[in-house]
Amino acid sequence: MYKRQGIAEADTEYGPVRGFLLRNIYSFRGIPYGDDTGGKNRFMPPQPPHAWQEIRPAVAFGASSPQPFYDRRPESYSMFVDHWNYDLMGEDCLRLNIWTPGLADGKRRPVLVWLHGGGFTQGNGIEQDSYDGENIARYGDIVFCSVNHRLGALGFSDLAGAGGEKYRHSGNAGMLDIVAAVKWIQANIANFGGDPSNVTVMGQSGGGSKVCLLCAMPAAKGLFHKAVALSGNTVKANNADYAERLGNAILHEAGLDTSQVDSLQSVPWEQYLELANRARQRMAAEDPG
């Protein structure tokens, strides 16, 4: 593995990064494509990352979006088939990973953007060993990217009914993260040996549904050129009425009224996920249909 100066270095619009070279594949892990989503950025559209001047290490996978964690260790066969890698969880989770066979070698390789499964509530870009892009980059001679984005109640709480215009994107923040990631790829992937005019988005299960939603989002128009949805598709998720009622139920569960929506931005994420889960359970009990 090579990591000395000048090896596995690439420029991005926000600053230079240094990954590593292993078995002739360049790997870059945990590159920020957006700012920390905590605090005042919670429920908001993704913001650009802060620029940096010095070479930034890109050798460790970024944090996963906060999510419920289920201990699978006692289930030996489940662990054998699905080796789940959650690692750190936190709201500074807008990170992507890149594997490429070449840097600044004059080639324009196809780009494959992988969207993980997990039903919009769980997962990350490297949760399973098969999501590691080294081999597909090598044997396909492509640039492979995987993405972390907001999930569950932090990515899809519709608070616009209570919070008004400020929160109008809160119910779709997680998908807007993915749009921001593909925009970043469009702007920067040429520096990693990729062709921004040949980008495919691909996902499995919940990731397949995300692919279908991207195809329907005006904000994603022109950012990719092919799409592959594996064992998952989406025509419609929750309707607007349900989403708004759930947002109001979360406020009620937190003991807040509509004038206090901003207070939800300062609730620890662990507590917020629990509030949202209780609100969802209460709504289901009140209206089981």
Predicted feature descriptions by range:
Residues K221-G232:
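A conserved short beta-strand
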Residues L230-G289:
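Substrate-access "cap/lid" subdomains that shape
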Residues K3-N172, P196:
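Non-catalytic accessory segments of hydrolases
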Residues Y167-A190, A249:
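Alpha/beta-hydrolase active-site loop
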Residues T100-K107, A187-D195, P218-K221:
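Surface-exposed acidic, glycine-flexible loop patches that form ligand/cofactor-binding
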Residues G208-A220:
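Short glycine-enriched nucleophile-adjacent loop
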